[in-house]
């Protein structure tokens, strides 16, 4: 594996990690829409709007205690699985330190509700849309650069942005960073086999055998194959380690009026079909050098996207 090289100047950006950890926070801050009562001397940012990206209106939510704060663009994963309600629910403290920007990418969330059949929806269009959004944010808040965070498949978009447009960003942070889906798949499958053998789970072992053989009963499509494995990862606690947090995540997805009746899997399946399952074959291991500071945050109990794959990429 080639070594990913980092420009580690401006190490003050390490402070960003203290904020970014809040993105995966484990407790609700109990503030309406993630905001405390603000001082009259500040000009807070609390905007929910549609921005034209790639020729189509897409939903963007910007929240911060002051327009003077640094801007952080959060790229959700899936593709087709928005994080806006989760960011509202878990991340009140972050909006005191930064202007947190949540974008529902084309084909999901409020963007999907506004336009359920976007003309452009591909890995390339997502990167292009994110680049356009970056330019919009820089102009809107008069910033030379912004901070960039990519989560799960959003980390694929993030790495490509950081590689192609380093002058736009202070720092890139990959949360559950995707490097090679096939390598992550192999590590995840090996973990599942060990778990199933330890528990003498004959049913799980049989399902794993069918998945490996790409049997049509579980792998009619590449998405079906992924979901068949995901069910087992979920069963053994390899997605959300703490069951109490799983309940909080479910609560976040249903408590806000604008997402209360949102069909998460309808949009996810739509996006997967439109993108021909490309998310499940992604490999960006050829990105071996970035010109900005980069940080990877991985969960030691994450066996959907095992952190060891990203760790190996930089060692």
Q: Language-model segments: which ranges?
A:
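Conserved acidic catalytic loop of the alpha/beta-hydrolase fold
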Residues: 125-145
